[in-house]
């Protein structure tokens, strides 16, 4: 399961979501401005900004628009 933690008007967030959508990679989106528990969770894992992409939990996660990591997800999904 892929979860993208995001906020409104976030360009890197939009790029990340667009990549996932264009490549038909299933994911859920959590707006951290509306979900304080999610915001606390990403902070607990050391992240200070969004987007944060978590793949099957935070053991495999990263911050920012990372085309290299997204390409890896695309390869797995194919």
Spell out what each predicted region is.
Residues 1-25:
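Local sequence-structure signature of Cys/Sec-based thiol-disulfide redox active-site neighborhoods
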Residues 1-3, 27-28, 57-60:
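Short active-site oxyanion
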Residues 45-54:
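Structural micro-motif
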Residues 55-78:
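Non-catalytic, surface beta->alpha helical segment in thiol-disulfide oxidoreductase systems
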């Amino acid at each position: 399961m892929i979860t993208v933690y995001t906020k409104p008007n976030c360009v890197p967030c939009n790029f990340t979501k667009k990549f996932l959508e264009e490549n038909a990679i299933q994911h859920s989106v959590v707006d951290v401005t509306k979900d304080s528990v999610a915001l606390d969770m990403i902070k607990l894992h050391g992240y200070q900004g969004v987007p944060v992409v978590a793949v099957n939990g935070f053991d495999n996660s990263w911050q920012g628009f990372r085309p290299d990591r997204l390409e890896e997800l695309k390869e797995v999904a194919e």
